[in-house]
């Protein structure tokens, strides 16, 4: 009977666990839709802002070096900005970013560059802090909103801008999880600063589409929203000089790109958590069914044994 009790206790435990995972799945499913809509809503603004910047730069006669955020220099120090979550129970979401960061770190070290880390999310901070002898951590950020806000993006952008403008780093790359759909999210590496990618840039740069070509700002054609924005009028009149506008709008553009990376990461985390909890619920259901069968078999065997003992006793 002790065996029956153990099986019965396991069945109760598994069913209670399934209730928890099912509740977490429903919560993640409700949030991921909002996060997905937020990602899609933010894309037209960034696309239009990129085109405005291109229009402004087309009227400029000064060299790129006059815009600090467009300056390129000899690469010596590169900062990797890794975006993870504060919580677990989301499948391989956090571990995939950590693995990609380690891989990129090794690639750049192998090319002779000094590499620093800026970490977003408790999971990345915990992992790399435990290996502080191997990695140089410049800054950390935790406690961001589940639905990222412009304030979150501003605090991070302010930090990395200060590093770049003070020439503490020559290049900043962000490693985050690109949201594709509810079942597909990929960790990607994207160049954040400067806006002129060079040889070691990754090839899958799809979100940060503002770049430079022949010393002029251009907009790369890549994967974007389904609805294309209409072209800008060619006769726009700006009150300020192009130089003033460019230097004022570039930080806004970078902040917007940081916000979009955070938004895509948040949507990917929620989608991964929803998938993980759905799988956990299915596994709990299957396990409960198996345990119930085992319980019934054990109970039937116990009853049969008791009957045999009674029959055997009566015969003697």
Swiss-Prot record:
It is found in: Cellular thylakoid membrane. The keyword Thylakoid applies. GO terms for molecular function: ATP binding; proton-transporting ATP synthase activity, rotational mechanism. GO terms for cellular component: plasma membrane-derived thylakoid membrane; proton-transporting ATP synthase complex. It is a peripheral membrane protein. InterPro entries: ATP_synth_F1_ATPase_gsu, ATP_synth_F1_gsu. Its main location: membrane. Pfam families: ATP-synt. Keywords: ATP synthesis, CF(1), Hydrogen ion transport, Ion transport, Membrane, Thylakoid, Transport. HAMAP family: ATP_synth_gamma_bact. F-type ATPases have 2 components, CF(1) - the catalytic core - and CF(0) - the membrane proton channel. CF(1) has five subunits: alpha(3), beta(3), gamma(1), delta(1), epsilon(1). CF(0) has three main subunits: a, b and c. Produces ATP from ADP in the presence of a proton gradient across the membrane. The gamma chain is believed to be important in regulating ATPase activity and the flow of protons through the CF(0) complex. PANTHER family: ATP SYNTHASE GAMMA CHAIN (PTHR11693), ATP SYNTHASE GAMMA CHAIN, CHLOROPLASTIC (PTHR11693:SF41). Belongs to the ATPase gamma chain family. This is ATP synthase gamma chain. The gene is atpG.
């Amino acid at each position: 009977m002790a065996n029956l009790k153990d099986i019965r206790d396991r069945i109760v435990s598994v069913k209670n666990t399934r209730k928890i995972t099912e509740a977490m799945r429903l919560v993640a499913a409700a949030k991921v839709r909002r996060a997905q809509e937020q990602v899609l809503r933010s894309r037209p603004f960034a696309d239009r802002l990129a085109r405005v910047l291109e229009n402004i730069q087309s009227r400029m006669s000064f060299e790129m070096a006059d815009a600090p955020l467009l300056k390129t220099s000899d690469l010596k120090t590169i900062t990797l900005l890794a975006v993870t979550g504060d919580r677990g129970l989301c499948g391989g979401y956090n571990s995939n970013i950590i693995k990609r960061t380690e891989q990129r770190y090794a690639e750049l070290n192998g090319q002779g560059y000094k590499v620093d880390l800026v970490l977003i999310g408790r999971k990345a901070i915990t992992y790399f802090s435990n290996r502080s002898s191997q990695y140089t951590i410049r800054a950390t950020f935790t406690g961001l909103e589940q639905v990222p806000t412009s304030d979150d993006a501003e605090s991070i952008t302010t930090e990395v801008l200060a590093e770049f403008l003070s020439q503490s780093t020559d290049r900043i790359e962000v490693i985050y999880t690109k949201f594709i759909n509810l079942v597909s999210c990929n960790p990607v590496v994207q160049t954040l600063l400067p806006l002129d990618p060079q040889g070691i840039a990754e090839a899958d740069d799809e979100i940060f589409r503002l770049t430079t070509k022949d010393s002029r700002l251009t907009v790369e054609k890549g994967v974007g929203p389904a609805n294309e924005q209409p072209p800008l009028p060619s006769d726009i009149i700006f009150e300020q000089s192009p130089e003033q506008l460019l230097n004022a709008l570039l930080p806004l553009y970078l902040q917007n790109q940081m916000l979009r990376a955070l938004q895509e990461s948040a949507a990917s985390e929620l989608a991964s958590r929803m998938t993980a909890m759905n799988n956990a619920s299915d596994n709990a259901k299957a396990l409960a069914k198996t345990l119930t069968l085992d319980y019934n078999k054990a109970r039937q065997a116990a009853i049969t044994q008791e009957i045999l003992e009674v029959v055997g006793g009566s015969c003697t």
